């Protein structure tokens, strides 16, 4: 895995061999960021990637956050509850010189607290497939007021999973790649 674009373009991202870890592929990450930067649905909203604060739920290796930071995002909060993956996140952040732009919380992505009253412009939600965690994690973000009015939520789910619907969100774009479905939402 590597950073696709921005100030750290071409730098490698470390992962681990673990059957429970499913890092987003370079191709899928590139597609998501092309939509975030060039997609007409996103351009017509008030969202901009540059300077945004993001939250990465089920952060894994942190590759999504590191790609966003390389492309000009301001700060990232990564939520991950696997200690081995948290070590990988810190190794990657150190290697990419992003330690001062990230915060990592070892907490459950479906119930963590926003003690610092952070507000986010971008949320990336990539729960383990087949565990029905998407709705709970996104509802936690909404319930605790963690999203700015112009926030974009990117949800990755397995294609065969029943699509998540949210009364508080508008689905503005979907993209299927391989076995993954990417849904882009904004607050209503």
Where are these regions (language model features)?
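Class I S-adenosyl-L-methionine-dependent methyltransferase catalytic core
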Residues: 1-188
């Amino acid at each position: 895995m590597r950073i696709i674009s921005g100030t750290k373009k071409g730098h490698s991202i470390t992962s681990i061999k673990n059957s429970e870890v499913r890092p987003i592929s370079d191709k899928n990450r590139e597609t998501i960021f092309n939509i975030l930067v060039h997609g007409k649905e996103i351009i017509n909203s008030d969202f901009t990637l540059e300077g945004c604060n993001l939250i990465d739920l089920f952060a894994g290796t942190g590759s999504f956050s590191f790609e966003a930071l390389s492309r000009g995002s301001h700060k990232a909060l990564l939520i991950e509850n696997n200690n081995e993956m948290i070590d990988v996140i810190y190794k990657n952040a150190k290697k990419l010189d992003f330690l001062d732009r990230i915060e990592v919380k070892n907490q459950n992505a479906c119930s963590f607290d926003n003690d610092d009253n952070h507000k986010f412009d971008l949320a990336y939600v990539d729960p383990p497939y087949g565990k029905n965690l998407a709705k709970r994690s996104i509802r936690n973000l909404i319930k605790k007021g963690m999203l700015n009015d112009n926030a974009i939520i990117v949800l990755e789910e397995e294609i065969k999973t029943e699509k998540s619907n949210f009364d508080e969100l508008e689905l503005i774009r979907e993209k299927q790649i391989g076995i993954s479905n990417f849904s882009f939402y904004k607050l209503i």
